[in-house]
Amino acid sequence: MSDSKEQRVQPLGLLEEDPTTSGIRLFPRDFQFQQTHGHKSSTGCLGHGPLVLQLLSFTLLAGFLVAILVQVYKGPSSLSQEQSEQDVIYQNLTQLKAAVGELSEKSKLQEIYQELTQLKAAVGELPEKSRLQEIYQELTRLKAAVGELPENSRLQEIYQELTQLKAAVGELPEKSKQQEIYQELTRLKAAVGELPEKSKQQEIYQELTRLKAAVGELPEKSKQQEIYQELTRLKAAVGELPDQSKQQQIYQELTDLKTAFERLCCRCPKDWTFFQGNCYFISNSQRNWHDSVTACQEVGAQLVVIKSAEEQNFLQLQSSRSNRFTWMGLSDLNQEGTWQWVDGSPLSSSFQRYWNSGEPNNSGDEDCAEFSGSGWNDNRCNVDNYWICKKPTACFRDE
């Protein structure tokens, strides 16, 4: 029995070889069956053991062959992928090399550096920004332009004037005068560009004459000192002016004085009230808006047209004192929402603030304006109200 067991086990040893193609080591010993412990013998099972192991070995070998074939077929595709990536890298390197080849040569870079150096030196030598330098440059260009013009007695005279003006400008002391002359020169330059016409020459000559007069009026240094002292004294005097409240008080006193003077010279008819050069009549009876307009016209006046905030405050006070609703000369009869005075003038936007809250609301065809409480209200024009007429004062001497 021992010899037969050795003969059965011997073929299994052949399966211990290492398959090089797969790289996996298989040990079939691990698959040998262990004899089970029990009361019965396992001789029947061992009789079929070699056949099962052979079938299992063939199955594993077939799996290894399939794996090897898959790797063989996959190899060329991965190689082609690596090749394509190398091609892309090569193309990028080629493009980069071409771009580097297009860069400026060293001599070009040197040339650019020299240009920059020269430019830096030139910028460093630029003169400081001054109005006199600009004027001098303008005069130089202007002189060149005039020098190229056809010979003419008037042009020659202009050239001489410019020469003298150039000398005078070089000694200009005042910045304000420099600015004035610079502006004149700017206009003169524009005119010289259009010189061919005789009328333009005449215009330039007149400009030069005025410019020469302006230069001639520049004060000497001694005069400048005197003017400076005068300005200093004036500044001190301005500093001593009364404060704003004092100024307001003085203004009010002057206003009162003017009003008193007007009353002495100008009078209003009986039962009329004077205010700021006008006479106002406040009715004691009531009429509708249209009849109120007619009543004012009959006495040579107008249903009141308000021209200022002061006048509005004065009239509003007169109306509120008597607690009356009073017509004014304002309506939107011609076009709804467009308010207009009886003299044809439109209602100023600054006067919109005088409407009472929520007014005008056109509630029931309300097209005429009235003084109501502390502001204005729109009401139906056929309602009877008091009214105010306005006309200018008549100034005369007592008989």
Curated annotation (Swiss-Prot):
Membrane topology, from the record: Single-pass type II membrane protein
Residues bound to Ca(2+): 359, 361, 363, 366, 377-378
Domain notes: The tandem repeat domain, also called neck domain, mediates oligomerization.
Gene behind this protein: CLEC4M
Keywords: Adaptive immunity, Calcium, Disulfide bond, Endocytosis, Glycoprotein, Immunity, Innate immunity, Lectin, Mannose-binding, Membrane, Metal-binding, Receptor, Repeat, Signal-anchor, Transmembrane, Transmembrane helix
Designated name of the protein: C-type lectin domain family 4 member M
Stored SMART domains: CLECT
SS bond partners: 265-395, 268-279, 296-389, 368-381
Subunit organization: Homotetramer.
CDD domains found in the cross-reference section: CLECT_DC-SIGN_like
GO cellular component terms, A-Z: membrane
